[in-house]
Amino acid sequence: MNIMAYRNKKLYIILSLIVFSLAVTFIDAFVHPPYFSKIPIKILFFLALPMLFFVIWREEWSEFKSLFRFQKKGLLISLLLGLAIFGVILGGYFALRGVIDFSGVTASLTSGMGITADNFVWVAIYISIMNSFLEEFFFRGFGFITLKKYVNVKFAYFFSPVLFAIYHVGMLVGMFHPAVLALILFGLIVGGLIFNALNDKLGNIYPSWLTHMAANFAINTIGFILFGIL
């Protein structure tokens, strides 16, 4: 492989994740756009940054297709893990709601993003299914499976989870006490490592997507409770 092309591919992926993650967290923390107006912009960049990579370097097109190659192998483990994560997240909420103040969550969602009890169901559906798929394509497909061809595997394993956590910082700031926020971010990094491990064996994004959906279903169930819908 041409050394310059190899270097450029590596830099493109790394810079794409860094710039996008920092931009999203900055906008969420300081601009506070309405959630529904932010959706099309995020979709555009979630898709455009990876797709531009595969258009520039067409020899990598087979890599792109492999990210979506469906295999039954490993799906059962992903489903079982997803159910376990669902139980842990929901159980953790019920165990800690007397200790941790969750009242700032709905207030922050409403004031910062315009999410209310009236529109939360649509937000929950989008986050659980569509947004989780886009995040898996960007952070685990493009940011891990594709990246690890050009960097040390250990670096690839930790790079995308750290950026995945940074990407969430702007949205979570103000919802929780700093210590709780730090714990959540640590959980996002650990979750990213688990997602990478699931996808590493099969080379596609479906295992982590199923598990990610289960985690989001649990988080959104908590959201329904906090908004008084359940």
Where are these regions (language model features)?
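Short, Lys/Arg-rich, polar N-terminal cytosolic tail immediately upstream
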Residues: 1-7
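Alpha-helical transmembrane segments in multi-pass membrane proteins
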Residues: 9-61, 109, 113-114
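Hydrophobic alpha-helical transmembrane segments
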Residues: 14-15, 75-80, 121-125, 154-159, ...
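Juxtamembrane "helix-exit" motif on the non-cytosolic side of transmembrane helices
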Residues: 25-33, 96-99, 169-174
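Juxtamembrane helix-loop-helix connectors linking adjacent transmembrane helices
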Residues: 36, 63-131, 229-230
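Membrane-interface helix/loop boundary segments of multi-pass membrane proteins
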Residues: 134-159, 200-204
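Small-polar-interrupted transmembrane alpha-helices in polytopic inner-membrane proteins
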Residues: 156-169
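Functionally important transmembrane alpha-helices
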Residues: 158, 178-230
